[in-house]
């Protein structure tokens, strides 16, 4: 109940009208009150809504795959707005500027496309993200390699729009179908992960008590983020609560920092853990389960129903924001409660 009280309080504080947008990458393309993607899209020429949707997919997919935790020492100075941002917001704006520059495109005449990913280099990412010894970014090589594998696997992310649109029935597309397409098409990009019968399992881990635990945090974060460009293209996305909560360190950190979850061994707070360690897998799986538990409690406090306030709004308003706030109150730099070794593709 205490955690639900805290989340409801943060939602009312940030969104007094309770008009909370979906938890999506698009929230991170804002700076100094400006919607940078909207500005970019308004200036461009689109022959039809599908063309704009493909470009939005190009931006969103690449940006989400670059969105794993930056580490506490990185920041991004955006020249056009003069804003300096860190973590997800910084990564979001940096990735938008990288996309805008045409670095992902095969032709300078059409910069707002991502069809040159297979040849993307870490040095390009380092320059665009202002990485230096004084401004280090966690997992730089891993991020660039992930984009290259994305390009090798699917060519252009924008083409996923057409795949998803083709799965709509009478203009209606269930949100789990978005995730299904992503898991099918992006499977090959996840390296050094569990493989069963030749199939890469992605963000799936073995746990001694739970067996195989599928989490797919980045893929689900991407699925949530693709809802809006699909809607803008005229599709009706339904069953949004068919996606799960996100097992990342803001939501998971909320439950540790608020005392909902307690470490069996207090010394684990000072140790560094691998992503596949049973402690981390258990923490992430409990995070998904607890998000399902806390959502109705938050709605009850806000006096709203699930149909108007789906989990995507609870996350945004919400558990993610409260987790970040608690982290900032408890730790210098606002990092997660557990120290986790990241290659830039999970957290």
Mark where each language-model region is:
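Extended, well-ordered protein cores
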Residues: 1-235, 239-267, 271, 278-347
């Amino acid at each position: 109940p205490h955690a639900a009280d805290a989340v409801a309080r943060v939602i009312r504080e940030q969104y007094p009208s309770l008009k909370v947008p979906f938890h999506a990458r698009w929230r991170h393309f804002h700076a100094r009150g400006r919607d940078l993607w909207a500005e970019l899209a308004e200036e461009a020429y689109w022959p039809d809504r599908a063309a704009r949707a493909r470009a939005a997919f190009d931006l969103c997919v690449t940006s989400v795959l670059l969105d794993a935790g930056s580490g506490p020492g990185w920041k991004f100075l955006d020249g056009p707005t003069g804003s300096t941002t860190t973590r997800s917001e910084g990564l979001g704006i940096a990735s938008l500027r990288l996309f805008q520059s045409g670095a992902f495109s095969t032709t300078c005449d059409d910069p707002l496309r991502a069809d040159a990913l297979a040849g993307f280099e870490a040095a390009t990412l380092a320059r665009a993200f202002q990485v230096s010894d004084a401004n280090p970014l966690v997992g730089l090589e891993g991020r660039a390699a992930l984009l290259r594998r994305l390009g090798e696997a699917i060519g252009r992310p924008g083409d996923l729009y057409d795949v998803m649109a083709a799965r709509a029935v009478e203009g209606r597309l269930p949100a789990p179908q978005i995730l299904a397409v992503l898991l099918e098409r992006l499977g090959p990009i996840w390296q050094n992960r569990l493989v069963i019968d030749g199939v890469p399992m992605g963000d799936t881990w073995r746990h001694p008590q739970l067996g195989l635990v599928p989490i797919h945090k980045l893929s689900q974060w991407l699925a949530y983020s693709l809802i809006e460009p699909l809607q803008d293209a005229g599709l009706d996305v339904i069953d949004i609560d068919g996606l799960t909560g996100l097992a990342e360190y803001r939501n998971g950190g909320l439950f540790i920092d608020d005392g909902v979850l307690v470490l069996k061994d207090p010394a684990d707070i000072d140790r560094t853990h691998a992503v596949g360690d049973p402690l981390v897998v258990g923490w992430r799986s409990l995070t998904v389960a607890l998000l399902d538990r806390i959502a109705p409690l938050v709605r009850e406090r806000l006096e709203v129903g699930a149909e108007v306030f789906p989990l995507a709004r609870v996350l945004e308003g919400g558990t993610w924001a409260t987790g970040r706030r608690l982290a900032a109150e408890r730790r210098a730099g606002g990092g997660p409660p557990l120290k986790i070794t990241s290659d830039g593709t999970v957290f």
